[in-house]
Amino acid sequence: MVRKEDTLSLVEKTWRFDNKVAIKFDTHVNQSIPHYLDLQSYTVKLSEWFLKDNTLVYDLGCATGETIKQILNLNISTKFSIMGFDNSQKMIELAKRKTSKIIKNNERVKVDFQCKDITKINLKKSNLIISVLLFPFLNLDQRKALLKKIYKSLNSGGAFICVEKIRAKNSYFEDILNQMYFDFKLSKNLSEEEILNKAKSLRSSMYLFDEKKSKSLLESAGFKNYEFFFKCFNFIGYIAIR
């Protein structure tokens, strides 16, 4: 049972990843994203194919560092580096705190967390780039630019693993999926008021495209080889290989 005080009561007009959101983020996404724990597990499991010796891994929009924490806990001997970027200083602080003990006892992986505007970062050559629920908050121009950076950054055979939210192909399916999603959040003990407030706060912050457009943007950036590994309601996960 999720305690009422663990939920996010959003009364602000615009959604922001501020200190209040960061502190309760892990609980909040588990309430708000279908199969979120499984999604994290799938993302980390997929990463095993691309964690090569002496390569760099990026987590764009790393939030509280949960994905990186799980990668650090993998039972592998590969030596590599991970950089986690987020535009929230509080998220970065929480990520460092969450992973500090693991990093201290782990000599094979170098980890660096940085608070930066992800739309303005430069990416070095890498073998794996992960992005969990960042892209819905990027407008079309930002998305195009970042996808091109990601493709250019990846080594040949390197991978981009992305989880995002999309629109349905038409209004009929969009209505059905939205209602199912609403019921899902109610089942996670979010109140109707909390769900409505969250939806209102995201009006000017979220930019969603349908699956066809997402594929088109991937291909325009250079990715021709990609596959979907998750889909539930309006949430998808895919892996694209350069």
Which residues does each predicted region cover?
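N-terminal, positively charged/glycine-rich alpha-helical extensions of SAM-dependent methyltransferases
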Residues: 1-24
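Class I SAM-dependent methyltransferase SAM/SAH-binding core
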Residues: 58, 68-119
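C-terminal alpha-helical "lid/dimerization" subdomain adjacent to the S-adenosyl-L-methionine
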Residues: 166-220
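A short glycine-rich, Lys/Arg-flanked "PGG" loop and its adjoining helix->strand segment in the class I
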Residues: 144-156
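Conserved alpha-helix/loop element of class I SAM-dependent methyltransferases that forms part
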Residues: 35-53
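A conserved beta-strand element that flanks and buttresses the S-adenosyl-L-methionine
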Residues: 130
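Conserved class I S-adenosyl-L-methionine
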Residues: 54-63
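Conserved beta-strand signature within the Rossmann-like core of class I S-adenosyl-L-methionine
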Residues: 157-165
